[in-house]
Amino acid sequence: MTDLKPFLAKAASREPLTRDEARAAFDILMSGQATPSQIGGFLMALRVRGETVDEIVGAVTAMRSKMLTVEAPEDAIDIVGTGGDASGTYNISTLAALIVAGAGVPVAKHGNRALSSKSGAADNLAALGVKLDVGPEIISRCIAEAGVGFMFAQLHHSAMRHVGPSRVELGTRTIFNLLGPLSSPAGVRRQLLGVFSPQWLVPLAEVMRDLGSECVWVVHGDGLDEITTTGITKVAALEDGKIRTFELSPADFGVSPCVLADIRGGDGVANAAALREVLSGAKNAYRDISLANAAASLVIAGKVETIRDGMTLAAQSLDSGATALALDKLIAVSNDID
């Protein structure tokens, strides 16, 4: 079927779509076969009614079928957030990814430019000297040689160009804000996944379970799409096919609580400078929150069993220079420097 109208009519009637219907509808959207008005109407009908797990699974399946893939080790992990929390923090998941790579776990980092902040992962890494517009072979080399590779979302999900203008005109959150982090071009099955609202914790854990993920922690920390050190982090953890919910506090990581102002960053250049300060030994709130996210990622990856063991290994990665070396190698390989 190449006509969105039947799916639009069903969504407008507040009826949920089946997985197959959602996949078919999003195939149409991402193949350029729907008009801007149809795209906007369909996305808002889903948003107002509330997207279901089956609809998200179907949409992700469609998106994954069209993406440019990257070969990565089976045990690779992604540390990624939906964005959209409007917090303007430092690039926490970026530094956490480098720490995890330095600790010996391969990272296939998926990200984009800023959504609601001044600096997304792509902005931050570009300011650090990482080349973004590279092909799958170079990214695979980055993961193999640096321990971490960056997949620039817009290069791997070119089908999104068909819905981009409608999303901009709508100017509000749609299901597409959720789909990117769920559609890793490297097909990772282990993730630390931050979400902009706690309402999505369990639903997205269910989505990842149904899509075959092994271990995923979906997290929301005190308004952030990260594990936070400003207060309580809510977690829905998918492990061995089961989902459990729990909370984490700064004390669980052995760090002192901070306030949002302590981790608020600037643009890509400013955040790159802050990241390099931590690599050079700065002991501050940015270091603490990045270590916390890295520690959880090391648990998810199966590298350690406990958060505290994860903190120890993450700190060793930073303090030994292994994290800085991972960044140096990522810059060199992405720029194809021997």
Swiss-Prot record:
Listed cofactors: Mg(2+)
Catalyzed reactions per annotation: N-(5-phospho-beta-D-ribosyl)anthranilate + diphosphate = 5-phospho-alpha-D-ribose 1-diphosphate + anthranilate
Sequence positions that bind Mg(2+) 1: S93, E226
InterPro entries: Anthranilate_Pribosyl_Tfrase, Glycosyl_Trfase_fam3, Glycosyl_Trfase_fam3_N_dom, Glycosyl_Trfase_fam3_N_dom_sf, Nuc_phospho_transferase
Gene3D superfamilies reported for this sequence: Nucleoside phosphorylase/phosphoribosyltransferase catalytic domain (3.40.1030.10), Transferase, Pyrimidine Nucleoside Phosphorylase, Chain C (1.20.970.10)
Keyword Metal-binding set for record: yes
Binding site for anthranilate 2: R167
GO molecular function: anthranilate phosphoribosyltransferase activity; magnesium ion binding
List of residues binding anthranilate 1: G81, N112
Residues annotated to bind 5-phospho-alpha-D-ribose 1-diphosphate: 81, 84-85, 89, 91-94, 109-117, 121
Source domain of life: Bacteria
Keywords attached to this entry: Amino-acid biosynthesis, Aromatic amino acid biosynthesis, Glycosyltransferase, Magnesium, Metal-binding, Transferase, Tryptophan biosynthesis
Residues given in the record as Mg(2+) 2 binding sites: D225, E226
Annotated EC: 2.4.2.18
Biological processes annotated in GO: L-tryptophan biosynthetic process
Enzyme class: transferase
Cited PANTHER family: ANTHRANILATE PHOSPHORIBOSYLTRANSFERASE
Family assignment from sequence similarity: Belongs to the anthranilate phosphoribosyltransferase family.
Role, per record: Catalyzes the transfer of the phosphoribosyl group of 5-phosphorylribose-1-pyrophosphate (PRPP) to anthranilate to yield N-(5'-phosphoribosyl)-anthranilate (PRA).
HAMAP family named in the record: TrpD (MF_00211)
Name of the protein in its database record: Anthranilate phosphoribosyltransferase
Encoding gene (name): trpD
